[in-house]
Every structure is written in C-alpha cells, then in structure tokens.
Amino acid sequence: MNVECTRLASGLTVVTENMPHLESVALGTWIKSGSRNETEAEHGIAHLLEHMAFKGTNKRTARQIAEEIENVGGEVNAATSTETTSYYARVLKDNVPLAVDILADILTDSVFDEEELEREKHVILQEIGAADDTPDDVVFDRFSEEAYRGQTIGRSILGTPETVQSFSSDQIRAYLSRNYTTDRMFVVAAGKVDHDEFVKQVEERFASLPTTPSATPVMDAARYTGGESREERDLMDTQVLLGFEGKAYHMRDFYCSQILANILGGGMSSRLFQEVREIRGLCYSVYAFHWGFSDTGIFGIHAATGGEDLPQLVPVIIDELRKSSEVIHQQEIDRARAQIRAQLLMGQESPAARA
C-alpha cells in the first residue's frame, strides 16, 4: 500500500494511493459536512447544494461540466450523507488535471443561478416523492426520526417539499461559506497517480477555498431518544425495523457491534436468516445492521413480511436478540470476522473504493 498524505499551508489535506498497475484514477473531495450541519431552517440544503454544484460556474455551463468529463470517457458525481458530502470523478490517468479542474471549479466558483435553482428544486421534489413511494426508504426515515427525535441527525437528508421550495441562492452560499472550508476538506486520489504532481494541481486549483468559516459550523451533540412509529399503507408487505443505540465509529466497541450484526443477520448462515426465513418462512428479507456516526450509532434489524406474519415475526426477532445476549459461539465470531474481512478486502479492489 503506497499511501501518501500532505497537509497544505491552507489547511487542506491531500491523500493519494499510487496503484501503478492501473490506467485510471478515482479522485474526489470529501467535506466533513452533511445534513447534520444544517440549521432548523436549512433542512435539505446540504443535498440541494450538492445538486446545484453541477449547474454551472463562471467558467462552465451545466452542460459543459458534463460534456468535458464525458468527452474523455470519465464520469463525475456527488453524494450527501448525514455527516459528509463528497464530489468525485473517475478518469484515465492522463485526464487527472481536467478532473481536478472541474471539481475545483464546481466547489469554488459555482454561480447558483436562480433559474437553475428552481429547476433543480423540482428535481428534488420528485426525488422526495420517489422516496416516499419506496417502503423501505420510508421505514428507515421514520426510524431515524424516532431514534433522534427533533434533531438534525434524525432528519431525512432530502429535506421536505416546504423547506426545499423555500431556499434561495443566498442561503446556499451561506451554508457553503460556513461549512466548505479547507480545515474540513480532504482531496483524495487512488490509481495511477503521482503524489507530488497531484498535490501541486490541487494546491493551484483549490487556492481560493476559504480557510475559516463565515460562522461557526452547526452540529449539536446527538441524544438518542427512541420511540415507536407506525404508518398504515395499502401495500403487500409490511416493513419492520427494530433497533437501539449503537456505537460511534471511533469507539472500540464499534467493531464488536459490527460482528454482532453479522452474526445476527449478515448472511444466509446468520441466526435471523436461518430462524426467521429458513425454519419458519416468515419473511423473504431479514438482516441486521450497525451504522456509526461521529458521536453515536444505530444497531437495527430490518425485515419485510406479509401482514399476517407480523405477529409471529416480531417476537422471534426479539427472542434472537435475547439469545445473542446470553450465548455466542466462537465459531460464529470466527465466521463473522472472516465475512467482514473478506467484504472489506474485496471492496478495496477498485480505485474508486480505495479513494
């Protein structure tokens, strides 16, 4: 593993991993800011900003942003999560300077045109509608809302139709200047990349990034509350999600929770899959998961079942949770470790995953 890290004088961190056997490079900018960093009135603005970054700069139109990267066979995209936002590209090695230029351009010189903003709001309203029509999206949103009631960490990343429609270009700029600063950003590349050359390109193109926020970034400490939510819909399946507070990703017990989630519902040999599906036939899909955030976590079990099987399903899941607190066999731990290790290593076999 040939990983190099440089912290620029501006505070921006640049990390590369040279993979000389490849012909491509995956690169991107990761910002320690997501939906959790919004104020009450900004619900959904982090995600809207991610969309608007591709809608034109002082140098490029929205179409030019798409065409320039695709003209060389590359691709560019972005994603918003609860605590981070990322803008990334994948190109052949000779086109890295172009990708760096485009990423820097959209992050430092976007115009946030009002007409483009109104069009993109409409796109996001459709995205919100699509999520509301997807039962498993709905159950996870309701679960998060109950787990962290009244807190930004528990809110949907997409926002609501009301908040999305209310945003102006000035509000987007205010969020940007408060959160997109060099001390909160990492520029990363993996593939056939020379570290020193990449650092020089980043230093030149990202020079105009602010080094200090315009105001103190928002992120209140998480308080797990828990609760119950039920929503009746005319569907064939019933979506069920049971859970409790887990561990933050920097805690040692985070990895124990990952192993427990795998033992309970990480594959076809897991306890829940065997008991709930194979032996009792109560559902088609059942799995356990553990999400880690910076100061909290969520451990949960998700299943989809026919409504008539729900009264039997929930007690079985609870019983498996109880059993796991009493006895876990070494063979199960070893199998879970092997599965997690294999997933991690297999998932690192592409430059995009390593970036």
Residue ranges and their predicted role:
Residues M1-S10:
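Short, Gly/Pro- and small/polar-rich lid/capping loops
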Residues M1-N2, V25, G74:
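Residue-level marker for the onset of beta-strands and adjacent loop->beta junctions
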Residues G11, N18-I69, F143, Y180, ...:
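Active/ligand-binding-proximal structured segments within catalytic/core domains
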Residues R7, N18, A62-A221, R230, ...:
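Charge-rich, well-structured scaffold segments of protease-associated domains
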Residues L12, D194, M268-S269:
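A generic "binding-loop/recognition-motif" signal
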